[in-house]
Amino acid sequence: MTLLMCLLMSLLIFVRGCDSQFVDMSPASNTSECLESQVDAAAFSKLMWPYPIDPSKVDGIIYPLGRTYSNITLAYTGLFPLQGDLGSQYLYSVSHAVGHDGDPTKAYISNYSLLVNDFDNGFVVRIGAAANSTGTIVISPSVNTKIKKAYPAFILGSSLTNTSAGQPLYANYSLTIIPDGCGTVLHAFYCILKPRTVNRCPSGTGYVSYFIYETVHNDCQSTINRNASLNSFKSFFDLVNCTFFNSWDITADETKEWFGITQDTQGVHLYSSRKGDLYGGNMFRFATLPVYEGIKYYTVIPRSFRSKANKREAWAAFYVYKLHQLTYLLDFSVDGYIRRAIDCGHDDLSQLHCSYTSFEVDTGVYSVSSYEASATGTFIEQPNATECDFSPMLTGVAPQVYNFKRLVFSNCNYNLTKLLSLFAVDEFSCNGISPDSIARGCYSTLTVDYFAYPLSMKSYIRPGSAGNIPLYNYKQSFANPTCRVMASVLANVTITKPHAYGYISKCSRLTGANQDVETPLYINPGEYSICRDFSPGGFSEDGQVFKRTLTQFEGGGLLIGVGTRVPMTDNLQMSFIISVQYGTGTDSVCPMLDLGDSLTITNRLGKCVDYSLYGVTGRGVFQNCTAVGVKQQRFVYDSFDNLVGYYSDDGNYYCVRPCVSVPVSVIYDKSTNLHATLFGSVACEHVTTMMSQFSRLTQSNLRRRDSNIPLQTAVGCVIGLSNNSLVVSDCKLPLGQSLCAVPPVSTFRSYSASQFQLAVLNYTSPIVVTPINSSGFTAAIPTNFSFSVTQEYIETSIQKVTVDCKQYVCNGFTRCEKLLVEYGQFCSKINQALHGANLRQDESVYSLYSNIKTTSTQTLEYGLNGDFNLTLLQVPQIGGSSSSYRSAIEDLLFDKVTIADPGYMQGYDDCMKQGPQSARDLICAQYVSGYKVLPPLYDPNMEAAYTSSLLGSIAGAGWTAGLSSFAAIPFAQSMFYRLNGVGITQQVLSENQKLIANKFNQALGAMQTGFTTSNLAFSKVQDAVNANAQALSKLASELSNTFGAISSSISDILARLDTVEQDAQIDRLINGRLISLNAFVSQQLVRSETAARSAQLASDKVNECVKSQSKRNGFCGSGTHIVSFVVNAPNGFYFFHVGYVPTNYTNVTAAYGLCNNNNPPLCIAPIDGYFITNQTTTYSVDTEWYYTGSSFYKPEPITQANSRYVSSDVKFDKLENNLPPPLLENSTDVDFKDELEEFFKNVTSHGPNFAEISKINTTLLDLSDEMAMLQEVVKQLNDSYIDLKELGNYTYYNKWPWYVWLGFIAGLVALLLCVFFLLCCTGCGTSCLGKMKCKNCCDSYEEYDVEKIHVH
């Protein structure tokens, strides 16, 4: 029962008392002391190689868990590193060693064990970034060697303690991750780390730092010690009550990789890029460790490689990057890996890509996020608090710079104004915070370092200085916001002056046999120098030298210091370093400010201010209004828990409204990849270079902006735009209000090549256009006129509007936003619809200006032209000389070697077959280019013959007076001929190499041109195909859209109804507001379409009224049109139509034609007028007919000038020359498809968001030019055929010696005999050829009669 309870509890939390659940980590270390080490943090920090996070290279990305994607781009919210984050660099080094080939001694490490980092959301590690390159060794910077990859080691825990010397150690259970086995094993264990008490160990004397190490020449040889680092760690800590111990094997290589650690309720997760993406940055989870206690801190374990002095190697730095909850845009390849990424909150351009879920964005003006107006002041009402006590720094003797004093404050209110009033401030500079902010903010702690310091030396203490002050005396830390105050002490301050200013000008350690090796001892930020104890109060003389022998705990050697004395000034001059640390605790340090008019809101009514009202903080606009609510409660809230009213200490009641937020748009030009930022309808005085900008679509806050020069325009504040008074008539990036953004590559560029330019969009009238005559028809003809000017405004665009849907519906409440997620992509569709309306505006305005600027178009060419001979792509057949080959049996029975044959090997082989090979070698020599040549190979027979000849000539030389030396001539000739053969072969190879190089270069040039051309051609195909595929994919994805339901699956809806019911009230509110928002968007879409239609009308009026004289009555103003003028107006055009308007008319009797009585009759018709009767005569057969124009009554005789002959009974139609004959021929290049497009582009349908189908591209491709060029390139490739000189392969066979054949035959005979005896001489009844009987070895069996079976 006890065991059962123990197991049950272990599922919830590690039970410390269940011994059966612990892992045996024995053996424990039995070393009498820990290994000696030298901590030299300054040397390690000098070597810095920054590697910022680059999402485009997929740096540090953890692959989404439990799912995979293919060939898709999506925005994903998870744990990612910040783009551009430099991270923290860590470096390992080899240890000290004795002599050139001596064994290693003490370790050489940095102070990583003293650095405790916050774990937060976890981190990722870049490993081996510089592996395989050449670099320096930390311990010997002058030595360059190849860099190897080093794996990091970590301790992760939730609680800390300290050693007796104040150094941090991990308490309770800690997770330890250690690489081992010389980079082939990774250990992870969860234990209580109990410090050992022997010498140099954490609880012993002489402790400096814990670390792990491997002795390379012992642990990393043929047999790898898989526990070398683990055992070294055990020498510092006893591993107590370990709950698990896991190990993973690692393939040893020098490939760069990524490693990551996160934690959630399931435990600690480990990630690595080695699992599935070795040559990329994708990290996959490979282990989950049962660690459920929240990890708060981590420390990098120092590591030392104990190598001999002559075998030292450099080790690559690794980089740790913190993870944050961010939204990334991820691009998944076809094989499922992430190959591109964008940090959505990095800058405006990143938000643009993420807002539209695309890595490729076309040129345009896009809405990306919202921006809340910056506060213009502060309103504070708060209770009184206890003041921080600064009196210790105002009494006693002022300390020297190297012996500075420090005050740390918490849980009090400080009065910085009062403190600074006691000094004559000479300089007040800050880093990471402004002087005003540090005096007005609240912090978890406030630290003040102060010391006596002359103002004449203030340049030596500034950031970036490298003099003696920051090296040996005081180095300011910039880890937290900090300020530096340089001031003179006033006479009424009681602080005592020292005799003189003093500082350390040298602090070094002397080591070596003769103490001739000097190592400067630099200080780290916030640390004291080891030389400060020589003279804490100051130096008695300038250049005073001090020496002291260092203890073994201090690292040994001789400490030497030099002090410099500076004369004291009349008034004591001091330096104050104020550092603050932000936090969320209740023991905060807040300012006791001289609030001035911050206590009153009367001068800031109607403005956006930051307020702090008795602990309630926020940002809003205060207004006087009628009091509501209970006065004693001070605060009045609405049903959304928003502060809407406040009873102030001044007795007034103020309404509180939220500050105005404005839309943010990005102006983007694809050709230059430049962008600018537009803050709609806001003054630049409210916009800073890094404001609180938040995109609810990408859930990202902006962190960076490149440009910091705002420009005020009529449409809002723009950053990244310069004003050069440009006027353009064509605009691809309209901003509204007749403003345009011109990219820097434009012909209008005159100022900056790195910014957009602001231009005014203006219409310039053409010079002269000949009017087109036309006729009109009326029953009354004017007799008098007056001039009239008709003014007309046509709206061609509307103000672009974006709505933050989530903010409008939920007003920032998390519970509401979670329910709103159940409505699918409703909000995103709202934003898409509004963005579509904005794009429609841009298109209509661009079309308008293009139409009134030019009327010429260029026709498209359709189809593919030309024939393509694909056989040109075939590789030509290259033939060679025929070669004879031995049979398969011969290949089996002979040893062989294949060598290059320049052409003489076959003749040599045929000659050798005619007699004994050992005697015919020289006889069979071949001639090539006048040289005798032999193959560069000997068989055993020739080796024996030539060796015997050579030895015989040498041995007999003494007996024959050297005459026997002639026997060595065959050997010499053989060597000469064979060397000739080698030379001839090399010469042929060299010539062929030149031919190959020349032809290959020619082929490369042709291929380069060909691939470039094919890339241009196929990119057109890809654009067309991808555009259709993306549109169809978008259309198919709509099938899974919930369209406001909680799920697209009916079963899910039925299963989850009970969970929705509890949020019914909030759901009703969401429904009501979404309906209101939907109605607004619908109205906006109608207005947008109306403006687009009006833009077409404006285009027609420019072409007909401004460029020409219109004969249409009333189209270009009132009356008969004379001339029109047009000027720009907000969101449209303003027309001035000049015409004459009839004031009096006369009624006349008119006829459309006159005919006589001839047979056939002869008829005439008026030209641009009427035939009328004379009004002064009486109607009779003698009635006189006259002609008058249709626009002005002026009778005149009928002549050939104002009439024409026509045939009777035939209708006369006058066709204007600007109208094509209908249905005759398509002479205007406008076909039925174009007419449909002209119709449908002005028709908008809002069904279930199938608008994306309009983006399907049906463009016909014209690839004939590109394919023709490819034909020529392929011909050039075939021309690069390399006609090599014949250099075949020759296979030389070497027969086996006689004893091999003899053994081979004997084996065959033995095999045959074995078979014979097994088959013929075994078994009962055999006689072995009648020579042997075996009756005695056979048992007797009864014989049975067996019935015969007949098979028919």
From Swiss-Prot:
Q: Which residues lie on this side of the membrane: Extracellular?
A: 13-1297
The BetaCoV S1-CTD domain is annotated at 386-592
Q: How is it modified after translation?
A: Specific enzymatic cleavages in vivo yield mature proteins. The precursor is processed into S1 and S2 by host cell furin or another cellular protease to yield the mature S1 and S2 proteins. Additionally, a second cleavage leads to the release of a fusion peptide after viral attachment to host cell receptor.
Stretches for region Heptad repeat 1: 993-1043
Pfam families according to UniProt: bCoV_S1_N (PF16451), bCoV_S1_RBD (PF09408), CoV_S1_C (PF19209), CoV_S2 (PF01601), CoV_S2_C (PF19214)
Q: Where is this region: Fusion peptide 1?
A: 887-908
Q: Where in the cell is it found?
A: Virion membrane; Host endoplasmic reticulum-Golgi intermediate compartment membrane; Host cell membrane
Location of region: Heptad repeat 2:
1247-1286
InterPro entries, per database record: bCoV_S1_N (IPR032500), BETA_CORONA_SPIKE (IPR042578), CoV_S1_C (IPR043607), S2_sf_CoV (IPR043473), Spike_N_sf (IPR043002), Spike_S1_N_MERS-CoV-like (IPR044337), Spike_S1_RBD_bCoV (IPR018548), Spike_S1_RBD_HKU4-like (IPR044378)
Q: Which residues form a coiled coil?
A: 1022-1066, 1259-1287
Residues forming the motif KxHxx are: 1350-1352
One GO BP annotation is:
fusion of virus membrane with host endosome membrane
Q: Where is this region: Fusion peptide 2?
A: 906-928
CDD domains in the cross-refs: bat_HKU4-like_Spike_S1_RBD (cd21487), MERS-CoV-like_Spike_S1_NTD (cd21626), MERS-CoV-like_Spike_SD1-2_S1-S2_S2 (cd22379)
Listed A to Z, the keywords are: Coiled coil, Disulfide bond, Fusion of virus membrane with host endosomal membrane, Fusion of virus membrane with host membrane, Glycoprotein, Host cell membrane, Host membrane, Host-virus interaction, Lipoprotein, Membrane, Palmitate, Signal, Transmembrane, Transmembrane helix, Viral attachment to host cell, Viral envelope protein, Viral penetration into host cytoplasm, Virion, Virulence, Virus entry into host cell
Name of the protein this chain belongs to:
Spike glycoprotein
Gene responsible for this protein: S
